Amino acid sequence: MATSSTPKYNSNSLENSVRRSPGDGINHEQNDEISRLPGETLITDKEVIYMCPFYGPVKGRIYVTNYKLYFKGEEMEPLITFAVPLGVIARIEKMGGASSRGENSYGLDITCKDMRNLRFALKQEVHSRKQIFEDLTKYAFPLSHGLLFFAFQNEEKFPENGWAVYDAMTEFRRQGLPNDQWRITFINRNYELCDTYPPLLVVPYSASEEDLKRVAAFRSRNRIPVLSWLHPENQSAIMRCSQPLVGMSGKRNKDDERYLDIIRETNGQTSKLTIYDARPNVNAVANKATGGGYENEDAYPNAELVFLDIHNIHVMRESLKKLKDIVYPNVEESHWLSSLESTHWLEHIKLVLTGAIQVADKVASGKSSVVVHCSDGWDRTAQLTSLAMLMLDSYYRTIVGFEVLVQKEWISFGHKFSSRIGHGDKNHADADRSPIFLQFIDCVWQMSKQFPTAFEFNEHFLITILDHLYSCRFGTFLYNCETIRDKEKVREKTPSLWSLISSEKSKYTNPFYTKELNRVLYPVASMRHLELWVNYYIRWNPRIRQQQPNPVEQRYMELLALRDDYVRRLEELQISNSPKINRSTTSPSSPSQMMPQVQTPF
C-alpha cells in the first residue's frame, strides 16, 4: 500500500479537465508528483492498463486518495494522466474472472456521472484487484460505508467565505421586501411548518400564521405557496409550492382557495391569477390516485390553470442515459442527427425553457401574479422559477447573483440533491436519481448562447458548477434540504463552492458581458435554435472537442488586458505629473491652459 505523505499542494490540482493539451481530451503531464488538496491523503495505488477508447491500452498506475482516482500513464510521451473525483463515480464493477481468457479481459469497469466510463485491466493473479476494488468502493460511496464526505475533510482555505454569498434577508431587501403587501414570516424558523422549506418565508401581508398552517395541511409535504420573486414595478409575484391534496374525491379547502385569492389581490393589476402546473395533464390527473392532483377551476374561479407538459424525473433520467450512449465513447457521424433526436434530450430542454418563458412573460407583460408547482415543488418547479427569474432580473445574470439564485431557489427550497445525484451512495439504480439540475444549467447555457453579452459568467463557470455538483469537494450541494444541512453543520465544517469561484473570478468571467438593467430576456425555445452542449456532453472525446480556448474570446481577453495596462500606466502618469500640474497652475508664468487635459481613449 502506498504511503500517505502529501506532496506540496498545487492550487491548480488536476481535477476532471484541468491542464489538457490543446489537441485532445486527455491530460498530458510530465510532473512526477501527484498534486493533492489540503486534507487529501493517498489510500492505495496499483499498476494497471487503462483501456483508453481513443488511443488503445495505456500502461500506468492508478492512485486512490480519499478524494479522487488518479491515473498516470507510462511509455508515452508526453505522459497521459487524468483524475476523477470519487464523487463522480456512479458504479464500480468487476470485469472478468480468474479464468477469463483474452488479453486485458480482467479488471474494473467504472461508470461516471459526468458522461464518461473508465475501464482498467489488471494482471490476472489471485485477488490482484481485491484491494483496489474495496478501497475504491469504500471511498467512492462513503455513505454506504459509514464514512464522511471528503468535503468534511477538505482543509482548503480561501480568501472569501462563499457561505456568505446568500443571506435571505439581504435578498428580500434587494427585492423591496417587506412592504405593505408582503411580510416576512418566521413560522418555519425551526422547520416546524415544512421541513424542506427554508426558515424565512415571504407571504401575503394579510395571511395570518394560522392561515398558513391550514393551507399547509392541504399542500403536498406542507409546501405552501410562498414568494420567490416580486416584479419591482408592477408588483406581480412568482409564487412556488407543491400540488394540492385533492385526491380522487376532489376535496376542497376553503383556506387554500382564499389564500390563492389573497395572492391575486396583492398586485391589483389583473382579475386572474395564473397557476402553472409543470406536469402533463394526464400525469396531474394520475396523481389524484395517490392523494395529489391540481386546482379545479370551479374551486378557484379567479385562477387560470395551465399545464406545461414537462415530464417527470424518470423520463429525464432515461433521456440522459440515451444521450450518454450516443456521445461516449464514440459519436457515429452517419446517424448523428437521428440518434440525437431519439434521445429527446433537446425536446425536454425546449419544454422547460418554453414553460419558463411563459411564466416570465405573464409576470412582465401580462402583469399577473403566478403560482408554479409540479408534484412536490422541488424539481420542475425550481427549474421554472429560477429560469423565469433569470430572464426577468439582470442581477441573477451576474456571477454573485447566479450563486444567490442557486442557493435560494434550489438549495434553500429543498431540491433533493442527495437523492437526485446519489452522493456517496452505491445504489446506482435508485429510481430517485435524475438530471434535473443538469437540465437547468443546460437551459442557462442555451440562454447564454442566444444572449452572449447578457451574462457576466462564462461557460467554464457553468461546467465548474456541474463538476462540483458531483465531486463532494464542497458542502454546497450536499444533502436534500436545509434541515439536514443544519444538523450536519455543513456551513461550519465544509468549504463552499462559491469560495473557490470568488478566489479565481477572472477565470469564470465573460469578457463580452455588458451590464444592462431592467432588460428582460426572452430566448427562442424552438428546436431550430437549441444546440447540444458539446463542450460539456462530449468534452471527453478528443476528436469532437471544440477548440479551446475560443480564439475570439482569447483575443478579446488579450485586448482587455492591454486596455487595463494602458489605463494603469495612464493613472501612474497622472499621479506622477500631479505635483507639476499643481505648481504650474499657481505660477503666473505658466498658464493652466497650456497644460492639456490627459484623457484615455478607452
Curated annotation (Swiss-Prot):
Residues 162-537 form the Myotubularin phosphatase domain. Residues 17-33 have a biased composition (Basic and acidic residues). It is found in: Cytoplasm; Cell membrane; Cell projection, Filopodium; Cell projection, Ruffle. The active site is at C374 (phosphocysteine intermediate). Pfam families: GRAM, Myotub-related. Residues 1-16 have a biased composition (Polar residues). Residues 584-602 have a biased composition (Low complexity). The keyword Membrane applies. It is an enzyme of class 3 (hydrolase). GO terms for biological process: mitochondrion distribution; muscle cell cellular homeostasis; negative regulation of autophagosome assembly; phosphatidylinositol dephosphorylation. One of its GO terms (cellular component) is ruffle. Keywords: Cell membrane, Cell projection, Cytoplasm, Endosome, Hydrolase, Lipid metabolism, Membrane, Protein phosphatase. Belongs to the protein-tyrosine phosphatase family. Non-receptor class myotubularin subfamily. The GRAM domain mediates binding to PI(3,5)P2 and, with lower affinity, to other phosphoinositides. This is Myotubularin. The gene is mtm1.
